[in-house]
């Protein structure tokens, strides 16, 4: 297994899911840097909310991922690998993967895809509480533009995540150990 793909709408707490996997010995953590961290006290205490590379339109990596299905496997892997220099499985996180589950499954059939879902209003509320457009990493303002557009995008991403879950099934972990 070369990659673990993760899809979740902003505010779905998908980054928390990723952190539970990230510190495993088998994960390549070379994408981590102080520039790729976001700390916030939304939970009541200062906590690391985002760590490592995020891939989405308008962000540091994955600018073309809105149309990822128009690119070759080799072009995609070159972009996946760009922030990494180490060994191990690479976690590739993208909100827009929600719309491209079929493409990921077809091109990387041996790589797991983690779908993180949370109700639309809960996603938007948590994202706003965590800093919304003031979040310093990853940057949301270029692609997501404003709160109205963000709300629509969260709805669309969650819809496609639920549809992919219905199409492909999978496991629903009961706790962090199941991850």
Show the residue positions of the predicted features.
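PAPS-dependent sulfotransferase catalytic core
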Residues: 1-79
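PAPS-dependent sulfotransferase catalytic domain
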Residues: 88-178
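Short boundary motifs at domain starts and secondary-structure transition points
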Residues: 80-84
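N-terminal/domain-start segments enriched in small and hydrophobic, helix-friendly residues
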Residues: 66, 85-86
